[in-house]
Amino acid sequence: MSSHLSPGLHFSPERNWMNDPNGLIFYKGKYHLFFQHNPFENVWGNMSWGHAVSEDLINWTELPVAIACDDSHAIFSGSAVVDYFNTSGFGTLENPAMVAIYTAHKHDDSHQAQALAYSLDEGLTWVKYEGNPVLDLQLNHFRDPKMMWDRTTESWLMTVVLPKERKVSFYSSKDLKNWAHLSDFGPAGAVDGDWECPDLFPLFVDADESKIKWVLLISINPGGLNGGSGTQYFIGDWNGKELIADDVKTNWLDYGRDNYAGVTFNDVPNQRRVLIGWMNNWEYAHGFPTSPWRGTMTLPRELTLITKDGKILLAANPVAELDNYLGEKLSAGDKSEQLQIAATISTSEGLSTKFRVTANAGSYFEFGYDAKSKTIFVDRSNAWNEIPSTHVHSARYTGDEKTFDICAIVGSASVEIFAVGGTLVITDLLFLAGVRRSVSFEIAEGCQPPRSIAVRAITPRR
C-alpha cells in the first residue's frame, strides 16, 4: 500500500488490525489508549488489547500488547479505571491498581461474560483476575462494559449492552468484583442494528456547574444514519439507579460514515470529557486497502453540552492540544499534507458556500453549506475507490443565525467537519490519490466566499 493513506495525525498501530478504542484513561500525566487489536494479522481476529500512550492526546507512542487473547478467550472491548481507594484489593493506597474490565469471548461457543485484569506498573503488564468472570448472564451477546466511579452513590458503575435486545444495563459494585443489577435502558431511538460500546457520563450544561445532565452514547451496527455503523446519544438525568431520558428520539453523534465505537477517557483533569472513536465503518472496514496496518482513530474530541433554541445538544470539537500542531497560514492554492480550514459562513444571502480540497494527483472532495437544502455536507464522490459506499453525507442546519462557524480537519486519508459550535459533525474517510500527496484548497466556482477563513498546515504525527 502506498503511503498516501497513512494516518499521519491520527493514531493507528504500526502493524496489523485495530478497531474499537478501549480502556481510555488518564493516569500520572499520560493518556492511555487501549484498543481492539489483532497482533498477528491485518484482519479482525485474535482479539487482544493493544496499547498506546500520549502526553497531549495528539502524539502517541505505541507500547507492547497489554492484554492478550489466550487459548480459551478473546479479549473484547471494555474500559479501565484506577482503583485509588483499593476497593478491589489488587493494589495498595500507595500504588493503586489500574483495573480493566473487558468482555471475555469464549472461542468454542461465543459465550460472552465480563472479566477483570489489573496492572501495577501503569498498564504495561497485566494479571487476569483468578475469579473471572465477575458478571456472567450465560449469554452469547452481552458485552462492552464501561466503568466509572459514581460520586452520587460512592460506588463503581458499569454500563454494558445486550446488543440483540437493544438494551443498556447498569450495574453497581463496591469492590469491582461483585456486581448488582440496577436498571435497564431501551430499546429506544435507533434500533435497526446491534447496540454496542455504551458510555454514560455527566456534563455541565453551558459550562454551568450548577446544572448537570448525563449523556448516554450507544453505537449501532448496522442501522447507522448513512448505513452500516453509527453512534446515537441520549441526554437525561441519573438518579443513582436509572437514566431518565429527556426524550428518546434519535440524536446522532456524527453525520458521516466513519466514526464508530467512540468512548470517553476516565479521570481527565479539569473534568474534561474527551472522546475517541474508530474512524471506519463495518460495511467496508476489511476492504480498506492499507498495509501493514488497518484501522485508524478519530482525532480526540472534547464533548460539552450547549443549549440551542431551547434544546440541550451534545457538542464535539477537536481538543485544544491540536493547536500546538498548527503551522503557518496558507492561501488558496497553497499545499500541505494536512490542513485545518476554519471559516465563518453566511446564510443571509441564500447562497451556497463550497470548498474543494484537491490532492496533487487530481482527486478531490468538497464540503460546505448548501443553501437550497440548508445542509452542511461532505461530498467524497471524487475521493473514493471502488468500495461500495454512499458519498454525500450531510447534516441539516436548523438555526436562524445569519452566520455559523465551520472547521475542517483534513488528514492524510480523512476529513472531520465540526460546525455550529460542534453540534453538527461529519467524519469521513477519503482516498486522496498521489504517492507524494499534498492538498490544496479553493472556493468552488459559483458559490459565495465565506465571511472569514483561516487555513493552516498541521504538523504530521510521524
Where are the language model's segments positioned?
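Beta-rich carbohydrate-recognition and catalytic domains
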Residues: 1-145, 149-195, 204-255, 279-329, ...
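Beta-rich accessory regions
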Residues: 207-209, 235-462
